[in-house]
Amino acid sequence: MSVFLHVTLEVHAAGLGRFLEGMEKTAVPFLEDQGWKLAGAFVQRTGRLGNVIDLWELDDFQHYDRALQAFMADDRFAAFAAMLAETVISETVVFADKASYAR
């Protein structure tokens, strides 16, 4: 049974473009190669501008750890982590199950 990963990132306004590019070119392709499915990715237009919300579908809780361990061992991770350190203010990670009424 799948588990969903809801990630909210508060990103510096000046770093939003760089963050989005890093996700598009590095993180998303790598994590999809690990079997994660990006169910949605959003940039807030109201509330705190620049917040980014990602919704991923994973096989199970262990899938999260396996993919992150593989990413941290990859040559691209150091540059990606440096970009995150410069652009992300905070990150909230939540695991969730699909509600009974979801289609």
Where in the sequence are the language-model features?
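Glyoxalase I/VOC metalloenzyme domain signal
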Residues: 1, 14, 58-75, 100-103
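Short, structured motif recognition centered on aromatic/hydrophobic residues
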Residues: 3-8, 19, 31, 52-58
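Short amphipathic alpha-helical segments
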Residues: 15-41, 72
